[in-house]
Amino acid sequence: MPLDKDSNPNSYMYSHQHIIYTALCVVHSPQTFGIDPVPISWGHPDPLVRGPIICTVRHFNQRNAIGAHSGSYCIYTGLAVAAGKLNPSYVPNLKLTSPVLNIGPYPSWYDPKKIASIDPFGHLTTEAYSAYLDKGFDIRPTIAVTKAHIDLPECREAVRTGRLKPDGKILMPSGQSVCHKAAIEPVWYLPEIARRFGCTETHLRQSIFRMTNGMYPELITRPDIKIFLPPIGGMTIYIWGDPDTIPDEDIELTCRVHDECNGSDVFGSDICTCRPYLTHAIEEAIKTAQRGGAGLVIYYRKEGRSLGEVTKYLVYNTRKRQEGGDSAENYFNCTEQVAGVQDTRFQALMPDPLHFLGVTKIHNFISMSDMKYNAIVNTGIKIVKRVEIPKELVPEDAQVEITAKVFHGYNAGKAYQGIDEEELKKCKGRDYKYEGGDGISDKDEGSVPKQSDSNVVEEHA
């Protein structure tokens, strides 16, 4: 089928009949006449042989990916079209969008066991797939790389107190730091995703189809299409210092992988250690860059252990209202009581951006999380030193979190040694005094069962 360049919203391409026809073709079997997806050979070192990811509405017969670009924001694209604000056939002008620095290629790009949740060629759309673009294919970047000036009050305070020393290149006298950053949308190669989670590809497809209420029927009807752009948040990479040093094991690399926590990261809630640990990592990243190395922070959109912010706040209420109040002893079980599971972040996919950057050795890992540590080293990346959050940075109400995590296996380092069962039982959180505010008091709520010692995982690391 020829590529349709018609941009008239009143044309047949945008008629009700054509939309229905498109829907039927998209979900039909691969044997349907006229359906001819561009082949994908995931892991091939030649981007043309590997093939471009095509997941747009303009060329459904050539689509080789399930889902849509922009993750959860694709729904807003639909709203923009429905409101008459966006022409559904609009093709982005990518002329001035190329990355501001070169990344790769690295051998890890060609190993599905190292990269299967992002497209390593996702930032090279105009470079690697110009021939397709010239033919009219609508190929969208899934990675964008730019520069930034980061202005954090913690860094300004660090300059004022002398913890950080401005150098005029990486850190300005104002406390602003200069870095590169890359935004990445998830692109899943389903066979490898299934392998990492210990299930069959068929079971993975069926589970996603079922738990999204049938949102993606092609997961069932198009087993020939192995690429899926899930409707989830992606990640942002921040790099301080020279990015070219990152693959060099002899040059210092400081790294933190951080999972989103809007309440703490943005608004400064003191119920967890997320923002102080993040800003501490940024300080250490700046210092490493000033020593000639590189500092790296990877920020994942995994709000509330990937359970979402509504669920997280329900858990907060459960923690504060349970019999005896908020306690480290029962910290983990509250999430399971509300959500049915303690954590859905599943760090098996987390190391992929590290391999995208060519990381093979991390000298300073700013995290106490065993889950993250194990996920990274299990892919072959060496970690020399694990850095705990300084005790003085732990907020008052976050003592419950840090105490529970260390007791149940969080890497304690030197600062948190000696947390035993007595300390666990003694550690209590702030009383929010809900009684009288909404008619619910502690005595009205059922008690939460005592925390089990099995299957304990951490919230944010």
Region spans (language model):
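Catalytic domains of riboflavin
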Residues: 1-461
